């Protein structure tokens, strides 16, 4: 049973809009990953954005719980139900239906769709929620409803804000399978398993803890797909379900060891962690030394260490990507699109770690001999620093020995290293590199960007650096220049850098390193520290960049206006000849939406609105309605740009009036990752060039069609194609030789031309009972097809047998199937075998 589909279809039938899973990396600065189904709707629940229309949503949300506050990493593999990656089924009502319908829907789905036995179901409610208690009695006996306090049955998002009582549905896995003293409703045993949590968000909690009723209460429910699948399939562990066993079986095949649950923790760790790794990589998270990328690295390296225990000495995790994509790519189609990339990234990370893991484990085992209770923090740091063992991996290895690591000493060594290493010194730049940046900051402080007001200026050279970012006193080769005052804008916020000249040296790039604005120059005449030089930007390039940057602001406004306020910027690139804007949205834009957006942007351009730039405190800017981006870090006063109806925080360069943008054309719309779309567009000179190219293409089409009326020419061409197709179809209706055996018309032969499917359909239509298998060769490629009508023989099996003789494979329905082959020399053998198979079956 496809529970994911059944759930979404069920709630769609109840008026819920199906919302695709949002990205695992949320637009929420307080979260490392999306860790619950309600996260994408958080702004609606908190009232930051209006209630959507329709006010009913349902989703299957991918979630990660590893790192941060919600971290299940250490438990994965050792329990039946902990996962780093899981799918959360949920239905949501934003001020629409409330308890009565939420309870009724849940009961209907569990008992009528999942068909779970009613005598195995129990319910909990909050001890003060008599309304929910009474509503449940319409569906289940009073004796099966339990009341608990705030700890178990009250949910809140934070210390303040929306909150409310919740009701949970439990499934009794059977007394005969459990014997713990905690196996009772409300106990810590595994017999009674919570499968669904219904949150009744009916209060607002103030800072002083007072609960006030919400005028329009909401519903937020969550049911783990892995858990409910295991229950439906009669398994006591999620890992024994159909969601995991294909992965575990593949691991077993690769290591040539049989999976046994009692000793199979390593199998389970790997099966869980490959799912997390695949999804995180597919959604743009990459292996890194910090942040989300480091969590991904920890997950994979923990799996690799368990692989080592199973005997894997070479990269193997990447070989599991195919089975994950086979299992989940049908619903999450982007997995298949990025499969090759994911496999390559995992393989490279495996090879990095496997090159050191053996030596690291030797050091670990040696220290283990000297450990009674607490493992040395110094050795744990050495494992981390030299051999790439994350601290929690060392802790995981010690857990198996009932030992702990000295985390305090580990942190001491970590802090000492940070204090010593310049590369670990952090600033707020857009680009990181190792170099003499800290020395420069200590000597000079931050240099000054004067490019908002000036396109050129006289300035003193404060420092020169070679290509490796080492300070030099003179520079003739290519390298970096730090000016006291610089007109060159550094790559930041998606806007590309200025170019131009410093003295006679061409500036190719400008970047920020820890708030130092440095320009990269070509080799040329010698420059010296303390020289006074003339710096000037390429004003034509700057103007074109400004036009494209201002257009991104108008585009962002148009997207939010036309698609909805859920749209937010997920990335951008602004260059002199194009712009690229990534934004959150759950589906591809259709032609009408794109036309509306393009039209809206051009209207704002034509309105000739003056650009208004203001500097103000961040909170004041937010109160004024200015849009701030989650992934940007703002400090002190911020720069607010108003362009007509658009108002955003931005440090880039812009036009003075929207009319300067010229024309705006959308060139392409595409998907970036789950829940993120991309628009590419051009303005000004690039827009004129785009239109010119389009007209030239149309002219070429006219020439090819030999018709100035393109639509008429295409229509004529379509008619000709249709006519040729009909001729081809008619030619395929050639009489096929056949013979009759016991009232069944049989045809097995090779054909050279014609539509093979049409020929089979025609043959089947002529007879009451028929079996036909045809083999066709075109361009050295073999195509097989079989059809069966009212005969106890399966077309899929028939065509598969023939294809295997020809070195291929295939299959299909019982009445029609296709396959491919490679070995032309065995066609006669395949025909002969197929005929024998048919005759035997009759």
Swiss-Prot record:
Swiss-Prot/TrEMBL cofactor(s): Zn(2+)
Keywords, in A-Z order: Aminoacyl-tRNA synthetase, ATP-binding, Cytoplasm, Ligase, Metal-binding, Nucleotide-binding, Protein biosynthesis, RNA-binding, tRNA-binding, Zinc
Cofactor: binding details: Binds 1 zinc ion per subunit.
Annotated compartments: Cytoplasm
This enzyme's EC code(s): 6.1.1.7
CC per GO annotation: cytosol
Keyword Aminoacyl-tRNA synthetase: yes
InterPro entries on file: aa-tRNA-synth_II/BPL/LPL, Ala-tRNA-lgiase_IIc, Ala-tRNA-ligase_IIc_anticod-bd, Ala-tRNA-synth_IIc_core, Ala-tRNA-synth_IIc_N, Ala-tRNA_ligase, Ala_tRNA_ligase_euk/bac, DHHA1_dom
GO MF annotation list: alanine-tRNA ligase activity; aminoacyl-tRNA deacylase activity; ATP binding; tRNA binding; zinc ion binding
Key word Zinc-finger present: no
Coiled-coil blocks: none
Family matches, as PROSITE patterns: AA_TRNA_LIGASE_II_ALA (PS50860)
Catalytic activity: tRNA(Ala) + L-alanine + ATP = L-alanyl-tRNA(Ala) + AMP + diphosphate
Top-rank taxon: Bacteria
CDD domains in the record: AlaRS_core
One GO process term, biological-process aspect: alanyl-tRNA aminoacylation
Regions that span the bilayer: none
Enzyme class: ligase
Positions bound to Zn(2+): 549, 553, 650, 654
Role, per record: Catalyzes the attachment of alanine to tRNA(Ala) in a two-step reaction: alanine is first activated by ATP to form Ala-AMP and then transferred to the acceptor end of tRNA(Ala). Also edits incorrectly charged Ser-tRNA(Ala) and Gly-tRNA(Ala) via its editing domain.
Domain notes: Consists of three domains; the N-terminal catalytic domain, the editing domain and the C-terminal C-Ala domain. The editing domain removes incorrectly charged amino acids, while the C-Ala domain, along with tRNA(Ala), serves as a bridge to cooperatively bring together the editing and aminoacylation centers thus stimulating deacylation of misacylated tRNAs.
PANTHER family: ALANINE--TRNA LIGASE, CYTOPLASMIC, ALANYL-TRNA SYNTHETASE
NCBIfam families: alaS (TIGR00344)
Family: Belongs to the class-II aminoacyl-tRNA synthetase family.
Protein name per its UniProtKB record: Alanine--tRNA ligase
Organism this protein belongs to: Campylobacter jejuni subsp. jejuni serotype O:2 (strain ATCC 700819 / NCTC 11168)
Gene assigned in the entry: alaS
């Amino acid at each position: 049973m496809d529970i994911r589909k059944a759930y979404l279809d069920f709630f769609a039938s109840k008026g819920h809009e199906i919302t695709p899973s949002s990205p695992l990396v949320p637009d929420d600065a307080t979260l490392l990953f999306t860790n619950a189904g309600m996260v994408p709707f958080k702004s609606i629940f908190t009232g930051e954005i209006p209630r959507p229309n329709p006010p009913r949503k349902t989703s299957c949300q991918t979630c990660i719980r590893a790192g941060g506050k919600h971290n299940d990493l250490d438990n994965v593999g050792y329990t039946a139900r902990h996962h780093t990656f899981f799918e959360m089924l949920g239905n949501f009502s934003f001020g629409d239906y409330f308890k009565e319908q939420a309870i009724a829907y849940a009961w209907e789905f569990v008992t009528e769709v999942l068909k779970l036995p009613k005598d195995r179901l129990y319910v909990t409610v909050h001890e003060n929620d008599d309304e929910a208690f009474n509503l449940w009695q319409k569906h289940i006996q009073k004796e099966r409803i339990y009341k608990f306090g705030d700890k178990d049955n009250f949910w809140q998002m934070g210390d303040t804000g929306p909150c409310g009582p919740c009701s949970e549905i439990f499934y009794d896995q059977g007394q005969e399978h459990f014997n713990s003293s905690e196996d009772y409703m409300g106990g810590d045993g595994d017999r009674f398993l919570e499968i669904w949590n219904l949150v009744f968000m009916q209060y607002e909690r103030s800072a002083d803890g007072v609960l006030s009723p919400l005028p329009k209460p909401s519903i937020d429910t969550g049911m783990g797909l892995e858990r409910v699948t295991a229950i439906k399939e009669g398994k006591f562990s999620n890992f024994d379900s159909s969601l995991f066993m294909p992965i575990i079986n593949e691991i077993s095949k690769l290591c040539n060891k049989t999976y046994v649950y009692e000793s199979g923790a390593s199998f389970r760790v790997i099966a869980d962690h490959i799912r997390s790794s695949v999804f995180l990589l597919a959604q743009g998270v990459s292996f890194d030394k910090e942040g989300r990328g480091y969590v991904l690295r920890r997950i994979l390296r923990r799996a690799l260490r368990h692989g080592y225990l199973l005997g894997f000495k070479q990269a193997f995790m990447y070989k599991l990507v195919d089975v994950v994509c086979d299992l989940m790519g049908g619903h999450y189609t982007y997995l298949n699109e990025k499969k090759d990339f994911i496999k390559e990234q995992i393989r490279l990370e495996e090879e990095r770690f496997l090159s050191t893991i053996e030596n690291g484990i030797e050091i670990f085992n040696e220290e283990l001999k000297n450990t009674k209770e607490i493992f040395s923090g110094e050795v744990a740091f050495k494992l981390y620093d030299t051999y790439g063992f994350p601290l929690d991996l060392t802790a995981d290895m010690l857990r198996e020995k009932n030992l702990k690591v000295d985390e305090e000493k580990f942190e001491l060594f970590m802090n000492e290293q940070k204090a010593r290493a310049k590369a670990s010194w952090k600033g707020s730049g857009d680009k990181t590199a190792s170099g003499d940046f800290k020395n420069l900051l200590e000597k000079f402080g931050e240099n000054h960007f004067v490019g908002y007001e000036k396109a050129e200026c006289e300035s003193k050279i404060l420092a020169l650096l070679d290509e490796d970012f080492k300070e030099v006193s003179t520079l003739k080769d290519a390298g970096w220049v730090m000016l006291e005052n610089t007109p060159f804008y550094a790559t930041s916020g998606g806007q590309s850098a200025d170019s131009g000249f410093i003295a006679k040296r061409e500036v190719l790039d400008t970047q920020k390193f820890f708030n130092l604005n440095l320009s990269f120059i070509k080799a040329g005449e010698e420059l010296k520290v303390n020289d006074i030089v003339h710096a000037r930007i390429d004003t034509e390039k700057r103007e074109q960049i400004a036009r494209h940057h201002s257009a991104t602001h108008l585009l962002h406004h148009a997207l939010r206006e036309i698609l909805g306020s859920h749209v937010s910027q997920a990335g951008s690139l602004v260059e002199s000849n194009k712009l690229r804007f990534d934004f959150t949205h759950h589906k591809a834009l259709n032609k009408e939406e794109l036309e509306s957006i393009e039209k809206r942007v051009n209207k704002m351009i034509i309105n000739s609105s003056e650009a208004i730039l203001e500097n103000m405190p961040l909170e004041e800017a937010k109160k004024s309605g200015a849009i701030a981006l989650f992934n940007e870090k703002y400090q002190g006063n911020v720069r607010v740009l108003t362009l007509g109806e658009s108002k955003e925080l931005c440090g880039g360069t812009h036009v003075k009036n929207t009319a300067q943008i010229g024309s705006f054309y959308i060139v392409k719309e595409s998907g970036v990752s789950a829940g993120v779309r991309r628009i590419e567009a051009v303005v000004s000179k690039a827009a004129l060039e785009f239109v010119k190219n389009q007209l030239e293409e149309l002219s070429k089409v006219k020439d090819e069609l030999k018709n100035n009326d393109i639509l008429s020419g295409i229509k004529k061409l379509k008619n000709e194609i249709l006519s040729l197709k009909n001729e081809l179809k008619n030619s395929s209706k050639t009489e096929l030789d056949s013979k009759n055996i016991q009232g069944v018309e049989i045809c097995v032969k090779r054909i050279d031309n014609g539509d093979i499917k049409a020929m089979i359909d025609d043959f089947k239509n002529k007879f009451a009972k028929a079996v036909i298998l045809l083999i066709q060769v075109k361009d050295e490629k073999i195509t097989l097809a079989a059809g069966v009508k009212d005969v106890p023989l399966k077309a899929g099996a028939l065509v598969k047998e023939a294809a295997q003789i020809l070195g291929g494979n295939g299959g299909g329905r019982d009445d029609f199937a296709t396959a491919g082959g490679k070995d032309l020399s065995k066609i006669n053998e395949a025909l002969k075998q197929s005929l024998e198979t048919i005759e035997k079956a009759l």
